[in-house]
């Protein structure tokens, strides 16, 4: 019989109660932990296949993250009333966890590992991604999966000059910094950050502050691991047959000849030809040669050759110095008709970005734990197969594309003007036309150009660069502007984006077991020099935002008192429909009374705005207005000063001379000048068309 026993550790991190519990739930998983920060609870499970897949050349890790609607007391929307495919937010949080734990698995491991995080309860204060990240770290620690080193993760905010560990949702709304860091006791393995143009010193200080919090959580996880006391499993890892590896290493000169070339296509062609030839040569010597093993050994020798070449020549495979950027090119407004466009080229990486401006009806509604908002700035990243010269099926955006799109969006979001300044919904799409490293940072640059091309009043350009790292024996070499080969064979992909004023986004992925803050400090310094050069090119392409395109809609924002919303809309939407018919402009009204008037011309928008303002306005006695006759009888007329806003005009108030019948002097549709003579307690109006008499002095 399975023994169920709650094994629990409790501590306090950032003034909040933290609990890790194991041994009672989900016991058929290799490891399962119920993690609780405050009243936000995640069940994190990890599973490992019993047998490795030795015929593949990668580590088969899958990470999923699910936010359950019941966690916040909601029933899912839609016809089926149940959770469906993961949202973009869930995918991004799954990637956050994946990137944190992937470097920690043993080299050569080929057992399938699946990580599943379910958010079971949420207090709307403590962000669940940090709970799930640490739940995963704890589940791996108590499992039999052979990860030798413990990790943990924290979020750091920066409010009023002070760092805040694991801030609440409310605190994050006030923070200049949203920094998520995962790491071991002494090194960092993952960073995801957005920042309001902060100085490098704030980020470096945030990383050091994060490490203190990480150690606190690791102490709790270590205590739980000791209490559970489960030994680690013995697994089979891929190891190279030494004789075959030595044979391949004897052909390092051929590797060098194929790899050392500045043109990506030429290099790939030469490497492909070498691979085919070497495989046939080795088959003759080693008849039992396994193709998957050959591919792994080939990649290992590639890595060794590239690193040795850099070490000995102090140059990179394309001839650049370690801190040298590839040739840059930027151009604005490259497409007709679209609201804005920008092209950015760095070496053999090329991105075309476009901007489309819309109204409030075009916003995206985000409904996630701790976040319900109308998202008015969206960036989407598209990576077609032709960008790498490959033939692949197209099946919608991949997790990678969603992740890259979000990174660019975060880098730009701090420069997007507020709704009060620019009442538009903004959609940016980045099309990767060529890829040879750091397409996300090229997308940031192209998007910055496109936004200014569209007339979005951004204060400054945003540029980005990807930094790499090569660890070779006792030396760490930081590389500026890594290309695809250096990303593939290197130890770090560190993306840094920002303006001339400061940093707006960071993203770090590593392939080693961690990187020191000192190395990252050096990389940020090197990135700032490169970013300055890139920004010069962006400003040369378009120094400031252009006027709105003629093809872009015209939008103005109006504040409507909440108690007047029904009056503006009218019965069955009659008033709004009529304004649209008469002016050609459309009106979107939010529940809080904020309205957006959208039209193709300034004239139509202003006409619609004036009509809305007249509906909302309470005319004062004596105020002169223009009215339209909507009904005429012999003794009185009904006149309208705005759609749905009418009053009475008596026959005696039309002329100083006697009129037998109003039907003789007025007709429906006629426009006349009137003034407010009376207004009763219910707001009903009586007008006069007589000339106003001057008050006696």
From Swiss-Prot:
Biological process, per Gene Ontology: mRNA catabolic process; RNA processing
GO cellular component terms, semicolon-separated: cytosol
EC numbers for this chain: 2.7.7.8
Broad class of where this protein is predominantly found: cytoplasm
Chemical reaction(s) catalysed: RNA(n+1) + phosphate = RNA(n) + a ribonucleoside 5'-diphosphate
Keywords: Cytoplasm, Magnesium, Metal-binding, Nucleotidyltransferase, RNA-binding, Transferase
Residue sites binding Mg(2+) per the record: 487, 493
Residues covered by the KH domain: 553-612
Known function: Involved in mRNA degradation. Catalyzes the phosphorolysis of single-stranded polyribonucleotides processively in the 3'- to 5'-direction.
PANTHER family to which the protein is assigned, alphabetical: POLYRIBONUCLEOTIDE NUCLEOTIDYLTRANSFERASE, POLYRIBONUCLEOTIDE NUCLEOTIDYLTRANSFERASE 1, MITOCHONDRIAL
NCBIfam families in the record: polynuc_phos (TIGR03591), PRK11824.1 (NF008805)
Entry's family note: Belongs to the polyribonucleotide nucleotidyltransferase family.
Name this protein carries in UniProt: Polyribonucleotide nucleotidyltransferase
Organism: Coprothermobacter proteolyticus (strain ATCC 35245 / DSM 5265 / OCM 4 / BT)
Source lineage: Bacteria, Pseudomonadati, Coprothermobacterota, Coprothermobacteria, Coprothermobacterales
Protein encoded by which gene: pnp
């Amino acid at each position: 019989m399975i023994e169920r026993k709650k094994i629990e550790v409790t501590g306090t991190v950032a003034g909040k109660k933290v609990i890790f519990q194991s041994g009672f739930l989900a016991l058929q998983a290799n490891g399962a932990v119920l993690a609780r920060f405050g009243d936000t609870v995640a069940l994190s499970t990890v599973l490992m296949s019993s047998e490795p897949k030795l015929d593949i050349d990668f580590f088969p890790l899958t990470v999923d993250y699910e936010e359950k609607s019941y966690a916040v007391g909601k029933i899912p929307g839609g016809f089926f009333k149940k959770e469906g495919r993961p949202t973009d937010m869930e995918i991004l949080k799954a990637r956050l966890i994946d990137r944190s734990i992937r470097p920690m698995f043993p080299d050569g491991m080929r057992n399938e590992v699946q990580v599943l995080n379910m958010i079971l309860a949420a207090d709307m204060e403590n962000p669940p991604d940090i709970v799930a990240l640490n739940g995963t770290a704890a589940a791996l620690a108590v499992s039999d999966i052979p990860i030798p080193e413990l990790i943990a993760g924290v979020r750091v905010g920066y409010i009023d000059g002070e760092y805040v560990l694991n801030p609440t949702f409310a605190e994050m709304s006030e923070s200049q910094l949203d920094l998520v860091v995962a790491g071991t006791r002494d090194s960092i393995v993952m960073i995801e950050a957005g920042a309001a143009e902060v100085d490098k010193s704030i980020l470096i200080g945030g990383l050091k502050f994060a490490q203190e919090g990480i150690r606190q959580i690791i102490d709790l996880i270590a205590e739980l691991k000791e209490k559970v006391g489960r030994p680690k499993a013995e697994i089979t890892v891929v190891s190279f047959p030494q004789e075959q590896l030595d044979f391949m290493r004897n052909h390092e000169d051929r590797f060098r000849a194929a790899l050392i070339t500045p043109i990506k296509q030429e290099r790939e062609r030469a490497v492909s030809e070498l691979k085919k030839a070497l495989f046939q040569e080795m088959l003759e010597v080693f008849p039992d040669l396994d193709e998957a093993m050959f591919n792994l050994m080939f990649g290992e020798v590639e890595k060794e050759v590239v690193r040795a070449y850099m070490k000995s020549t102090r140059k990179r495979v394309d001839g650049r110095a370690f801190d040298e950027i590839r040739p840059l090119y930027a151009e604005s407004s490259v497409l007709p008709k679209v609201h804005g466009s920008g092209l950015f080229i760095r070496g053999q990486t090329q991105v075309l970005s476009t901007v489309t401006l819309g109204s409030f009806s075009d916003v995206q509604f985000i409904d996630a734990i701790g976040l319900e908002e109308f998202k008015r700035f969206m960036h989407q990243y598209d990576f077609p197969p032709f960008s790498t010269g490959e033939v692949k099926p197209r099946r919608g955006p991949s997790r990678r594309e969603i992740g890259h799109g979000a990174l660019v969006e975060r880098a730009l979001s701090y420069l997007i003007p507020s709704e009060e300044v620019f009442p538009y919904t903004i959609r940016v799409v980045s099309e990767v036309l060529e890829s040879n490293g750091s397409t996300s940072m090229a997308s940031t640059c192209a998007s910055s150009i496109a936004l200014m091309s569209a007339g979005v009043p951004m204060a400054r350009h945003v540029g980005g660069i990807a930094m790499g790292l090569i660890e070779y024996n006792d030396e760490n070499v930081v590389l500026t502007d890594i290309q695809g080969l250096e990303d593939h064979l290197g130890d770090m992909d560190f993306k840094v984006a920002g303006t001339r004023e400061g940093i707006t986004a960071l993203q770090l992925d590593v392939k080693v077991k961690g990187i020191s803050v000192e190395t990252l400090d050096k990389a940020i310094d090197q990135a700032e020099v490169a970013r300055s050069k890139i920004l010069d090119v962006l400003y040369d392409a378009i120094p400031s935002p252009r006027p709105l395109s003629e093809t872009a809609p015209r939008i103005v924002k109006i504040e409507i008192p909440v108690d007047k919303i029904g009056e503006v809309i009218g019965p069955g939407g009659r008033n709004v429909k009529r304004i649209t018919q008469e002016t050609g402009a459309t009106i979107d009204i939010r529940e809080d009374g904020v309205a957006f008037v959208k039209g193709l011309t300034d004239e139509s928008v202003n006409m619609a705005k004036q009509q809305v303002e007249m509906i909302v306005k309470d005319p004062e006695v004596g105020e002169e207005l223009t009215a339209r006759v909507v009904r005429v009888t012999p003794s009185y007329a009904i006149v309208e000063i705005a759609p749905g806003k009418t009053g009475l005009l008596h026959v005696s108030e039309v002329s100083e001379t006697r009129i037998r019948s109003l039907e003789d002097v007025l007709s429906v549709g006629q426009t006349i000048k009137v003034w407010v003579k009376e207004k009763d307690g219910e707001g009903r109006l009586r007008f006069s068309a007589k000339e106003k008499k001057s008050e006696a002095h």
